Structure formats: structure tokens, C-alpha cells
Amino acid sequence: MKKIYSYLLIALLILVLAACNNSNNNESANEEETAQTETKSVIDEIKERGVLRVAVFSDKPPFGYVDEKGENQGYDIVLAKRIAKDLLGDESKIEYVITEPQARVDLLKSDKVDIVLANFTVTPERAEQVDFAHPYMKVAIGVVSAEKSPISSVEELKGKKLIVPKGTTAETFFMKNYPEVELVKYDQINEAFEALKDGRGDALAQDNALLFSWANNNPGFTVALPTLGELDYIAPAVKKGNTELLEWLNVEIEKLYEEKFFTKAYEETLKPAFGETIKADAVVVESKVE
């Protein structure tokens, strides 16, 4: 009987040791898997996914819009395709995520996109929430109005309604500097322009580069107030702290500067919309901005 108890104790001991060994092996495997996940770079994840997720506009020609064939077009799209080509070897490996101005920051924070290329103006407030790469456009706030009653100064907006798209630098600028001006706000950019055409406001404030194009293609309207505030820059944005992708983008953009890529993109996408009155160097950036 003592021998049987001894055998049982030995068997039980073997089972306990085996269970401990399996547990240690599982823990080691989990730790190794976690370590591999933690060390996997952001760029490796994009390459493994096989597509670059880019936030763009669908209703802001000539910068970002969807054409009659349902294809994304515009100045921002030309840049997105080049980034995808240099990062993934194929300009078509892009998942376009359509956005409105007020949603751009949240898309990055929630990891729904890798890069925002939606005409994103650099501001100190935004730079606290996202990281901006080198710029590829320069812009100021402008005001477009009807030719029959042009607005050429902020003083002329007193007692009138100014249309602004929500989440734009134009909205912020007027709320901060001219709170007495009555703002009529719209979620979508195309809605804002339709409101101006319908007479639901006396003028519309937005990036002047966009207004030059819109007025050129909409007879009866003029950008009589082309510049307000300081000159701003438009740049790609990545999630705050995404240093690896930010550094890759900066190197990429510096290479594009050397190629005069943005001037060529202007000639292809913006010049036909702007006409001959606006020159490339008034809009594009081809060198680092300190």
C-alpha cells in the first residue's frame, strides 16, 4: 500500500511540474508576442496592411473632390498618390477616408487614418493635438461676395451675415478677432457655398486659395477681400507622437521640394481652376519653412 501511495505522489508531482512548465512556456510565448507587437514599427504596420489610409475632402475642388466617375481628384490627391507610391510601391494602394473640416483631428486620434491631407492649415491649437510635417501650400483667410455688393473690408460686414464652414481657420479667426460679426455656420463646405449662392448670407470666409478657384468658376462673385490675418501654411498631419511616420514624411517632402513636385502639381490641378491671375509661387511651397 505504501508503494502505491509513493507512486501516486510521484505521478502527482510530475503532473504539477508539467503544468508549471506549460504555464511558463505560455507566458514566455505571450511575452515574446507582446514584445514583437510593441517593436513593430508604424511603417511596418502600414506595409503589412497594404494600403495607406488618407483623410481627404470630397467636395473641395480643386484640392480634394470626387469627379463624375466617382474617383478622387485634386492637388491633395496628387500628393497622396506620390506618398503611397514611394512608401508602398504603388500609387493606387490608398484608402481614401472622406472627412469634413471638424473631423480631421478626431480621425487621427482614433487611428482611423494614417495621414490627413485635407487642406489642413497649421495652427498652434491644432499642433497641440496632431503633428504636422513640412508644409506644401501657403494660404490666408479671404472673403468672397457678390460682385454687385462686394465686401472689401471687415468693417463692411457689420450688420451682415458671414458664412463659414465649421472647423475651419476662418471660423476661429472671426470668433476670436471679430466676435461682433454674425456667423452662419455649415458642416459641409459645399453647403456653405450653396448658402452663399442662395443669398442666405452676404459673404463667405474660407482659405483664399479655395475662394480664388470658386469665384473663377462662379460668375457673379469676387474675392474683394483676399487676405485677412497672417500667412498660414497647409501641411500633412499625423497622430500626435507618431514620430516615425512624421520623420518619413519630412524626408519625403524634402525630396519633393528638390523635384519642384508641388509646382508641377499646381500646374496640373490648380492652375486650370485659378486661371492666369494667380501664379504658382503665390500658393505652393517648395522649401522648408523655419
Go through each PLM region and give its residues.
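C-terminal motif of bacterial Sec signal peptides marking the signal peptidase cleavage site
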Residues: 16-19
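Extended ligand-binding regions for polar small-molecule ligands
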Residues: 21-23, 31-32, 77-78, 82, ...
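A ligand-binding cleft/hinge motif common to bilobed small-molecule-binding domains
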Residues: 103, 120-128, 173-176, 190, ...
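Short loop->beta-strand "edge-of-pocket" segments that line small-molecule binding or catalytic clefts
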Residues: 51-56, 73, 154-168
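Acidic, polar ligand-binding/catalytic clefts
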Residues: 81, 93-156
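Extracytoplasmic small-molecule ligand-binding "clamshell" domains
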Residues: 32-116
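Periplasmic-binding protein-like
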Residues: 58, 137-145, 208, 212-253, ...
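Short helix-initiation/N-cap motifs at beta->coil->alpha
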Residues: 39, 94-106, 149, 184-194, ...
